[in-house]
Structure formats: structure tokens, C-alpha cells
Amino acid sequence: MPVDFNGYWKMLSNENFEEYLRALDVNVALRKIANLLKPDKEIVQDGDHMIIRTLSTFRNYIMDFQVGKEFEEDLTGIDDRKCMTTVSWDGDKLQCVQKGEKEGRGWTQWIEGDELHLEMRAEGVTCKQVFKKVH
């Protein structure tokens, strides 16, 4: 049985986010705005089907996918690229590989207690975010 990621999560910390955005070639103005945001995550999980909504006052991003199946991800509003994305289970963690223009792009997501941990990677840069479950 996979881990239950269902819930609404509020951001607690966001380490190295601006450097991560720089690695994605996000322009300086958007990096500064994005770095000030404290987005929430809303995750709806039905077995291996997941919808992850990243919600902020500036912009929302919705990722709808089936674990284990490659799909084209449109990152308009983030770095305006498209990539071929696969999310897989690695024990109790979700591992995402995003194949495209940027080397080593992807993320890992897992739960510790009532916290959601997310590590995002691109071009050798890692950003670490932590969220607390509120419901």
C-alpha cells in the first residue's frame, strides 16, 4: 500500500529556492517574487493517481499524473518548458524524473510525521521545502 499523501499542506521552510530557480533560467524579477511566496500544497491521491496543486497568491500550478507512467509536463508559469516526466515509488518516497533541457531535473517527496518533505533538483542545485499538514 503506497503512502497516503492526501491533505492540505502549509509551507514551513524553503531552502535554496532562488538558486534552484536560477538553475532553471528563471528571470531575476520572477525569482525575487517567487522567493517571497509561501505556497500551499493540496494533494489528492487515489491509489497511484495523484493531483498535486501548488497554490500561491501569485500563481497556481497543477500536476495530474499516474505513478509509473511517463507524461508530457507543461511547466508554463514556472520556467516555460515542457519535459517528459515520470513519477515512481521508491519505498515510501515519490521520485520524479523530468527529462528535457535541464540536466538532473526532478524531485523527491516523502512524509515524516505530519510534515511533507520535497527536494527539487536541477543542474546540480537542490532546493529543500518542508510543509506541515493542516487537514
UniProtKB/Swiss-Prot annotation:
Binding site for all-trans-retinol: K41, M63, Q109
Keyword hit for Nuclease: no
First-listed, main subcellular location of the protein, grouped into a coarse class: cytoplasm
Keyword DNA-binding: no
Keyword terms: Cytoplasm, Lipid droplet, Retinol-binding, Transport, Vitamin A
Gene Ontology molecular function terms on file: all-trans-retinol binding; fatty acid binding; retinal binding; retinol binding
Superkingdom of origin: Eukaryota
Cellular location(s): Cytoplasm; Lipid droplet
Gene Ontology BP, a term: fatty acid transport
One GO CC term on file: nucleus
PANTHER family: FATTY ACID BINDING PROTEIN
Function of the molecule: Cytoplasmic retinol-binding protein. Accepts retinol from the transport protein STRA6, and thereby contributes to retinol uptake, storage and retinoid homeostasis.
UniProt note: domains: Forms a beta-barrel structure that accommodates hydrophobic ligands in its interior.
The protein's name: Retinol-binding protein 1
Provenance organism: Rattus norvegicus
Taxonomic classification: Eukaryota, Metazoa, Chordata, Craniata, Vertebrata
Gene behind this protein: Rbp1
